[in-house]
Structures are given as structure tokens and as C-alpha cells.
Swiss-Prot record:
The keyword Metal-binding applies. PROSITE patterns: QOR_ZETA_CRYSTAL. Pfam families: ADH_N, ADH_zinc_N. This is Zinc-type alcohol dehydrogenase-like protein SAR2277. It comes from Staphylococcus aureus (strain MRSA252). NCBIfam families: adh_fam_1. Belongs to the zinc-containing alcohol dehydrogenase family. Quinone oxidoreductase subfamily. GO terms for molecular function: oxidoreductase activity; zinc ion binding.
Length: 335
């Protein structure tokens, strides 16, 4: 089997250190399935992981994947050889930048039948991230009618996570306010279903007041938590909930949350597979719900760019694009 990996952490300005490696195709054990990978999607987390310490070389990144089950471990009950599945994997195992991959069945689901592989593969990592935020952290209801009247502000609505988060929030009854800064990203947010799109390069508090937007129940920050920390505290309702997927780079005053009794949470969708939590199966269930909503027409895929062929050059170019931080939607590589 072919893999694209690297032997030491590197920045892109050092040149392309991705290389092709060959190894024997693995055999699935326990609850693992062996997937022949058809397409992958590259995420910002790939660019961060590329710069982290390599404990075992070569390091093979890649999280989102779609492919065909080729073999199953003895404890597998959810899948059979021939099933087409999608998933987001885990950073403590070999990634999807390869022709074959082992993955636990608990974080996998059957892929939607009504869209292409390079469309479906845009959804697992970002979709699970958004589902965990809305249902595990914000604890919104699975009954859309019970969420009517509640609102969420999604900062950076045109990114991969923001794109699917907007659709999920709308599907389950929330009023959705997102942010963007360019005409094309504003139009994309509207296409995803946002009720209101604000400019995140201008004062959000002022825009809320000018447009007479009430304080929101929830805020989902998908970009630069430090920059928006104080703004989010101003825009959240008392007893509201803020969740971010972006780690702090600076010290922030947690006491500032006290006056409104705000709950602040970090979302990291890899926590379940890394620690093999007892409820890891939730990721399978969330992916099943994504498939159901894609097939019923409630969600749309978020793929905007597709590269043909898994190669060091294509992977390097994908990382370059993501590090420019101007991507709309998701970037996919067909194997």
C-alpha cells in the first residue's frame, strides 16, 4: 500500500518534505475495519499536526476519508466487506493519506448514496465537530420545534466547520447568524442557510445594535478565539454557552464570564477516539444522521476544490491553500 508521509515536522517555506512510502497492507483486528480509501479531505488540523513532533516516522496524516470496506476484525458488527463508508479517523493512528487505512467501526458510518465520494468526504470531521458542539455541549433538542426561538452566532461561517454547522443549526430549528468578510464568503454563508451574515472584520457588537439583533443563546467560534473573546462575552445572553474549536494563543480573563454566568467550552472531536471513551459510538451515530440528512436533502456537501491523485505535490499544494486561511468550504483529493 502507498502512503504519503514525512519524517520530521516542517513548515511549508522549508520546501516539500512529503514523501511516498510503501508498506504491507495491514490486517484488521478487534473492532477495526480495513478501508480501501477512495478520497480524502484536507483540514486545518492537518497543517497544525504537520508541525508537531514526530514520535514515529514516517508520520502519515489525513483524517476525513471515504472508501470501501475490504476486511473486518473479529469483533466488528456494523459493517461488511463491500460497504462504502466515511469517517474522520484519529490523530493517534495512521491517517488517511494512504491507499488503505485501519479505523475503529465506532467512528465510521455508511456514506450517503445520493452524492459523489468527493462530495461526501467533505463532511465527517467538520460534521462531527458541529454535532458534538450542538448536541453534546449546547444540548439543543433533536426535535427542531423545541429549538425555535433560540439563536446561534457562528464566527467564520464560510469555513469547513462553519459551512456544515450552519446547515445543522437550521435543520434543528435555530436562528443562525454567521460572519464573513468578502462578497463570495457572504454569498456562501447565505447558500448554507444563514439568516443573517455579519462582517467579522468590522465591529460585531455595533452591527448587532444597528441591525437590532438580540443577544444569542449560543456562540460557536471557529476562528481566532483570542480576537473575539471579549466580543463573544458581550453578545451572549446571560447563562449562555460559548464553544470554540480554536485554542487560545494568549492568556484570557475567565472571570469575565462570571457576570453573565457564561459556560465556555473547548470542542475537540478527536477526544473520543484518542481516549476511546465509552460513548465513542456517538460519532458513528452522528455520521449516520449526516447521511440521513444528506439523502433527504436537508444538508448539502461543502466541497469546493478537488485535486486528482494522492501525491506529495498535491498534498503540499493543499496545505499551502489551507494556510492562506481564505478557503471556502472543503478541499478534497481523489486517491
Amino acid at each position: 500500500m502507498k502512503m504519503i508521509g514525512f519524517e520530521k515536522p516542517f513548515k511549508l517555506e522549508e520546501g516539500n518534505l512529503f514523501k511516498v512510502y510503501e508498506q504491507r497492507k495491514p490486517t484488521p483486528e478487534n473492532d477495526d475495519i480495513l478501508v480501501k480509501v477512495n478520497s480524502i479531505s484536507v483540514n486545518p488540523v492537518d497543517t497544525k499536526q504537520r508541525q508537531m513532533e514526530v514520535t514515529q516516522a514516517p508520520r502519515v496524516l489525513g483524517f476525513d476519508a471515504i472508501g470501501t470496506v475490504e476486511a473486518i476484525g473479529p469483533n466488528v458488527t456494523l459493517f461488511s466487506p463491500g460497504d462504502v463508508v466515511f469517517y474522520a479517523g484519529s490523530p493517534n493512528r495512521q491517517g488517511s493519506n494512504a491507499t488503505y487505512q485501519l479505523v475503529s467501526e465506532a467512528i465510521v458510518a455508511k456514506a450517503p448514496h445520493n452524492i459523489s465520494a468527493n462530495e461526501a468526504v467533505s463532511l465527517p470531521l467538520t460534521g462531527i465537530t458541529a454535532y458534538e458542539t450542538f448536541f453534546d455541549t449546547f444540548k439543543i433538542s433533536h426535535n427542531p420545534s423545541e429549538n425555535i426561538g433560540k439563536s446561534v452566532l457562528i464566527i467564520n461561517g464560510a469555513g469547513g466547520v462553519g459551512s456544515i454547522a450552519t446547515q445543522i443549526a437550521k435543520r434543528y430549528g435555530l436562528t443562525v447568524i454567521t460572519t464573513a468578510s468578502r462578497q463570495e464568503t457572504t454569498e456562501w454563508c447565505e447558500k448554507m442557510g444563514a439568516d443573517i451574515v455579519l462582517n467579522h472584520k468590522e465591529d460585531l457588537v455595533r452591527q448587532f445594535k444597528e441591525k437590532e439583533i438580540p443577544l444569542v443563546d449560543y456562540i460557536f467560534c471557529t476562528y481566532n478565539t483570542d480576537l473575539y473573546y471579549n466580543t463573544m462575552i458581550e453578545l451572549i445572553k446571560p447563562l449562555g454557552h460559548i464553544t470554540t474549536i480554536v485554542a487560545f494563543n494568549e492568556d484570557q480573563d475567565l472571570n469575565a464570564l462570571k457576570l453573565k454566568s457564561i459556560t465556555f467550552t473547548h470542542e475537540f472531536m478527536f477526544a473520543r477516539p484518542i481516549h476511546r471513551t465509552p460513548d465513542m459510538i456517538k460519532q458513528h451515530e452522528y455520521l449516520e444522521d449526516i447521511t440521513k440528512n444528506i439523502e433527504s436533502g436537508h444538508y448539502q456537501p461543502t466541497t469546493t476544490q478537488v485535486f486528482e491523485g494522492l501525491s506529495p505535490e498535491n498534498l503540499y499544494q493543499a496545505h499551502l491553500l489551507l494556510e492562506k486561511q481564505s478557503m471556502i468550504g472543503k478541499l478534497v483529493i481523489n486517491i
